[in-house]
A protein has these predicted regions:
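C-terminal segments of enzyme domains that contribute to small-molecule binding surfaces
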Residues: 3, 99-130, 161-203
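Beta-rich strand-turn-strand
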Residues: 126-139, 145-149
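Glycine-centered loop/turn positions within well-structured domains
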Residues: 149, 153-155, 163
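Catalytic-loop signature of eukaryotic-like protein kinases
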Residues: 120, 138, 155
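Flexible, glycine/small-residue-enriched loop-and-beta-strand segment within the central core
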Residues: 22-23, 39-131, 168
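Short, T/G/N/S-enriched strand-turn elements that build extracellular solenoid repeat scaffolds
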Residues: 29-32, 54, 73-74, 151
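Conserved G/P- and acidic residue-centered "switch" motifs that form tight phosphate/ATP-binding loops
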Residues: 141, 159
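Extended, small-residue-rich solenoid/repeat segments and analogous flexible loops
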Residues: 1-43, 105
Length: 203
């Protein structure tokens, strides 16, 4: 029966335009809730708890080579590059025990705090987002950044550790974009909007 159910789920996903490159990369206890036209490349998914699924929004994608660990959500219209690690725990080895090796410290249990990614977030290649970090809507994370603190909406972050270099738009424009919640508009209507001019878009 489980194999039949899995087959039905895969057929349903295909009809919705959902793509998962390799199901074998998803651990047995990892549960995914994916909206239409969301895509996962060759990504390792190892969520810590079966009762805490990952929710991935419509039209978001994550390219190959990455890992999803302590992560609870990816918003809509997110673009996530290659070799990105989302929800990297800081305490997955016991540094205050006699040995940090799990060969002799197997009884150790790491904490469990989750990261989240907002809507319309662009994360470039080779980024690490630490567990517990919240990345706001519209943020941009530059290549090779290590994000250790929350990122406010529409901020651009680069470096290790990641630091904000500037905002994408003015404060007024950011407030208006957040109020618009354009990512919840029907996709057919979105295609006719002027995405190349923020002021015209917000009128």
């Amino acid at each position: 029966m489980p194999s039949i159910l899995n087959r039905l789920e895969k057929l349903k996903a295909k009809r919705l335009g959902i793509r998962i490159q390799d199901f074998s990369n998803i651990s047995a206890q990892s549960q995914l809730v994916m909206e239409e036209h969301s895509r996962l490349g060759d990504v390792q998914v190892r969520l810590p708890k079966a009762d805490h699924p990952l929710r991935m929004g419509a039209y978001s994608y994550m390219r190959e080579g990455g890992e999803i660990l302590h992560l609870e959500s990816i918003g809509r219209f997110c673009s996530i590059g290659r070799n990105v690690v989302l929800g990297q725990p800081t305490d997955n080895h016991p540094i205050d025990w006699v040995s940090s090796s799990m060969s002799v410290s197997g009884a150790y249990e790491a904490g469990c705090v989750y990261s989240s990614i907002g809507h319309d977030v662009w994360i470039a290649h080779n980024v690490v987002v630490m567990a517990g970090v919240k990345i706001g809507d519209g943020a941009v994370i530059g290549r090779n950044a290590v994000v250790t603190k929350d990122v406010e909406p529409y901020q651009i972050v680069v470096g290790n550790p990641g630091k904000v270099v500037r905002a994408r738009f003015t404060t007024e424009q950011i407030v208006s974009l957040m109020k618009s919640e354009w990512w919840n508009i029907d996709y057919a209507a979105l295609k006719d909007l002027p995405f190349d001019d923020v002021d015209v878009f917000l009128k």
